[in-house]
Amino acid sequence: MGLLDRAGARLTGRPKEAEVLVVNTCSFIDTAKQESVDTILEMARLKTSGSAKKLIVAGCLVERYRDEIRKSIPEVDAVVGTGELEAILEAAGVAPAPAPASPFNILSGTSSAITLHGKESLAGTHKHEEIAFRAEGDLRERQGRFSREEWQGAAHMLPTYLYDESTPRFLTTPRSSAYVKIAEGCDHPCSFCVIPNLRGKFRSRRFESVVAEVQQLVARGVQEITLIGQDTTCYGEDLGLKDGLALLLDALASIEGLRWLRFLYAYPNRITGRLLETIAKHDNICKYLDVPLQHASPDVLKRMKRGAGADIFLKTLEKVRTAVPGIALRTSFIVGFPGESPSDFQILEEFISEARFDWLGVFNYSDEEGSGAFLLDAKVPKRTIDSRQRRLMKLQQSISKRAKQQWVGRELVLLAEGESEETPMLWEGRTQFHAPEIDGKVYINDFGELESLEAGRFYKAEITEAHEYDVIARVVSGPL
């Protein structure tokens, strides 16, 4: 959208008004594919009856079903894969605008800009002198990843695109928050996952590029940054950086005006002591960690090509909670993976009871063509999968309610997000223990001495009531 906006296209969220319809798709699991296809068909019908002259399909679905989309849906005029971002302009019939000077060049003369191209660039950078560069090239430990040999023959077909700080962005998030992608692709060969086929080999953005983009966003008024990637904890390893994510967090946390900084999707065996120390020492790094574990049974995890098990995970969680007291932990699991026996499920159930996650998601196994698990036998019946999913969510509901009850009486800083969708009598907000969009909500029913609140501002509030996933709060002071 940023490229289209910079080129002069007028963007609208109302499909009936558009001359060019763009459907950005996902194809990670069956439900995402179905939603994408349904939306494409809906836009195809709109194209034939409305003012739209072109229909473009973009994103992951194109990487998996490019030819099928073209053949099956003749209303589609163009397809744009995940590695073909620039092609959106030609597909939409929009002339590209001249690229402005790199925002990083503007920042390069300031003390807050960090340039790390090699060892020689570290001269005079006292704060970051501990950064250790390895030899050129990808020297990461195997850690269950695809080897160079396994990528041979496929690399030329995989996406390689990686945006940088000069790529124009059109923010669709609330004005106070933004996501920043620090890496693309994944090298982990998880047998249930097709992301490596859709997104390509793991590749990190340049350190200084991420810093520059966050500086730009904060200068525009963004106060909360969420770092994302398919595997954020491996950030920088392909660039030769050791503890790259910890170093990046250290640098970003020093940016004046950044109130909250968090990252999502930590691979469990990449959570280092240095990373935890960094989270603990900065007040503006949210005490929040999202670690998708996928299962707890060693047998299931082995078939998933992930390894470890409940005992190892419990030790990891203990290490995290000791290093960062009060941290909120989120995870996700897959039920119904091929071969998941009743005893495997029992191991998972008992692990969840003992681990006591603050937030938890349970996904039904999706049998994806092209994944390693697609070829496995001993498929679990859908009825059994649904039953197991409901059982785990009921268990987590009770765990979550007990955890939220511990919040009652505490005063926490929250970000006000606006009137509740349920009723204008309530406002919604989040604490540092809530990631955007995926966790519960804080409902504000008492503004204290204030007549009104302002979306995008921070307030101190007392938690007065707890439910399974949500809490009720009254404002004590602010805006902060």
Short names for language-model regions:
Residues 1-235, 274, 289, 311-322, ...:
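Proteins enriched for Cys/Gly/acidic motifs involved in redox and nucleic-acid/cofactor modification
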Residues 77, 223, 259, 358, ...:
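Short acidic/polar active-site loop segments enriched in Thr and Asp
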Residues 190, 210, 227, 263, ...:
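Conserved, mostly hydrophobic/aromatic
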Residues 55-57, 64, 219-345, 353-354:
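Conserved SAM/AdoMet-binding glycine-rich loop
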Residues 375-480:
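Terminal RNA-binding accessory module
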Residues 236-257, 303-307, 367-398:
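Radical SAM enzyme [4Fe-4S]-AdoMet core and its adjacent flexible, acidic
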Residues 163, 173-176, 186-188, 219, ...:
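Short flexible coil/turn linkers enriched for glycine and charged/polar residues
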Residues 195-196, 228-230, 264-266, 292-294, ...:
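Generic beta-strand/beta-sheet core signal
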